[in-house]
Amino acid sequence: MFYSILHTKFFLMIVKNIMKKYLNIGCGSRYHPAFENIDVNPAHPSIIKHNVKKGLPFPANAFEAVYHSHVLEHLPLDKGKAMLEECFKVLQPGGIIRIAVPDLEKMVRF
């Protein structure tokens, strides 16, 4: 968990300093004011209510960075693939995408 938090903070530090348009998918209650935040159950009025199983509500090349943490594993395989395609569609050329998923191998060992 600490490793994930450290990398997320590092990612946010880099992105905030060099990029202007970033998308945070499935943010839950951890939305970032500098991001365009979307979630199926928004925890704050500034978060866009949207189900990613229906695609992303943004045009192509809209963001310099796309981030989602612990979202992909909640989707069926076909919807997960479709969401990844959508992420790359809304990502500008040369943009950054960061995806965090659980380490299933580590979980099985315990």
PLM segments and residue spans:
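A short His-aromatic
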Residues: H74-L75
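A short glycine-rich, Lys/Arg-flanked "PGG" loop and its adjoining helix->strand segment in the class I
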Residues: K81-I96
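A short acidic, Gly/Pro-enriched loop at the edge of an enzyme's catalytic core
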Residues: K53-V66
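Class I SAM-dependent methyltransferase SAM/SAH-binding core
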Residues: K20-G55, E105
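A short beta-strand submotif of the Rossmann-like class I SAM-dependent methyltransferase core
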Residues: A65-V71, G80
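Hydrophobic adenine-recognition pocket in adenosine-nucleotide-binding enzymes
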Residues: V71, C87, V101-D103
